[in-house]
Swiss-Prot record:
Species the sequence originates in: Influenza A virus (strain A/USA:Phila/1935 H1N1)
Cystines in this chain: none
Free-text comment about domains: The probable endonuclease active site in the N-terminus and the basic amino acid cluster in the C-terminus are important for the shutoff activity. The C-terminus acts as a nuclear localization signal. The C-terminus is recruited to host protein complexes involved in nuclear Pol II RNA processing.
Active site: E80, D108
Marked site (Important for efficient shutoff activity) residue numbers: L28, L65, K202, K203, K206
Family under the similarity heading: Belongs to the influenza viruses PA-X family.
Alphabetical GO biological process terms: viral RNA genome replication; viral translational frameshifting
UniProt keyword annotations, A-Z: Decay of host mRNAs by virus, Eukaryotic host gene expression shutoff by virus, Host cytoplasm, Host gene expression shutoff by virus, Host mRNA suppression by virus, Host nucleus, Host-virus interaction
UniProt protein name: Protein PA-X
Length: 252
């Protein structure tokens, strides 16, 4: 998984993820799934803010790379990925400037157009379950929540998706590509349910110990753990072509 992450994500994102894990005392050599999850979350946050600006009239506009009129105010302030001390300094500055209510937990973004903090979620589970977990954690109606899944589903506070459909489609396509690349390397199932994989492996090992003294009998059945670890092959026809400006996983 670590090799996949380093090949799949921009070095800047990988470096930020490494710093984040180090800050919390986590070992990326051991917590490889968390390493991948942090990189994915960081990239979604960056993609969420990319190309979105506010013009002189206070309107939200999309400006592509290379546009000569790019000297505009960024619509989103990226908080995720910063050192915690710096991140809280940014949050306090935003609150003092805009009058926004200070969140109890560090959010991921601030939307200058809608004047609200945003919590971004990327889940391998059901979007509504993860949404409720985020809502219970933030405990603030003023923090906007937007959840994306690897299956193309999304859920947002009051069904307000903030971004235009095309911008959200880019994020969904990127997540689907990550899922497909993981599956092609046999990494997806363990990424989705690492606890279940560990539970099944422990169960199988315990069964092997109990049966070690019994006569050996060849079985054609597949171990439950191996079934879980089998790659989930995806239909490549469903993968849309990503824009050249966005990161892609290298082909095998």
């Amino acid at each position: 998984m670590e090799d996949f992450v380093r090949q799949c994500f921009n070095p800047m994102i990988v470096e930020l993820a490494e710093k984040t894990m180090k800050e919390y005392g986590e070992d990326l050599k051991i917590e490889t799934n968390k390493f991948a999850a942090i990189c994915t979350h960081l990239e979604v946050c960056f993609m969420y803010s990319d190309f979105h600006f506010i013009n002189e009239q206070g309107e939200s506009i999309i400006v592509e790379l290379g546009d000569p009129n790019a000297l505009l105010k960024h619509r989103f302030e990226i908080i995720e990925g910063r050192d915690r001390t710096v991140a809280w300094t940014v949050v306090n500055s935003i609150c003092n400037t805009t009058g926004a209510e200070k969140p109890k937990f560090l959010p991921d973004l601030y939307d200058y157009k809608e004047n609200r903090f945003i919590e971004i979620g990327v889940t391998r589970r059901e979007v509504h379950i993860y949404y409720l977990e985020k809502a219970n954690k933030t405990k603030s109606e003023k923090t906007h929540i937007h959840i994306f899944s690897f299956t193309g589903e999304e859920m947002a506070t009051k069904a307000d998706y903030t971004l235009d459909e095309e911008s959200r489609a880019r994020i969904k396509t990127r997540l689907f590509t990550i899922r497909q690349e993981m599956a092609s390397r046999g990494l997806w199932d363990s990424f989705v349910s690492p606890r279940e994989v560990k539970r099944q492996l422990k169960k199988d090992l315990k069964s092997q110990e109990q049966c070690a003294s019994l006569p050996t009998k060849v079985s054609r059945r597949t171990s439950p753990a191996l079934k879980i670890l089998e790659p989930m092959w995806m239909d490549s026809n469903r993968t849309a072509t990503l824009r050249a400006s966005f990161l892609k996983c290298p082909k095998k």
